[in-house]
Amino acid sequence: MASHPEQQSSSSSADVSSSSWGKVERKFTNKSASEYYDPCQDFADRSLRCMKRNPDDRDMCHDYFQAYRDCKKQWLTQKKLGSSSTAK
């Protein structure tokens, strides 16, 4: 009867970050070369807002931090795969 919230949160944050990357991938790939665009900025903003609401309790914002880490990891992986395929 006991559920494992850690497993649920990690799979749900992975789903969120993959769907978030899909939403911003087109915008990122179509930007000009000199323009900086961080597809994970929404997750960064959410984690900062959480820290402002809960200044003394980082544990309350763990899911936001993990979602940002997952998004950033996926973004960098996609970026590496994209640059290695164009370099060939």
Swiss-Prot record:
Stated name of the protein: Cytochrome c oxidase-assembly factor cox23, mitochondrial
Function comment: Required for the assembly of cytochrome c oxidase.
Pfam families associated with the record: CHCH (PF06747)
Compartments it resides in: Mitochondrion intermembrane space
Entries under InterPro entries matching the protein: CHCH, COX23, Cys_alpha_HP_mot_SF
GO annotation terms (biological process): mitochondrial respiratory chain complex assembly
Domain CHCH span(s) in chain numbering: 37-79
Disulfide bridge map: C40-C71, C50-C61
Span list, region Disordered: 1-23
Residue ranges of the motif Cx9C motif 1: 40-50
Organism: Emericella nidulans (strain FGSC A4 / ATCC 38163 / CBS 112.46 / NRRL 194 / M139)
Taxonomy, superkingdom: Eukaryota
GO cellular component: mitochondrial intermembrane space; mitochondrion
Motif (Cx9C motif 2): 61-71
UniProt record similarity statement: Belongs to the COX23 family.
Alphabetical keyword list: Disulfide bond, Mitochondrion, Transit peptide
Start-end of Low complexity biased regions: 9-20
PROSITE patterns: CHCH (PS51808)
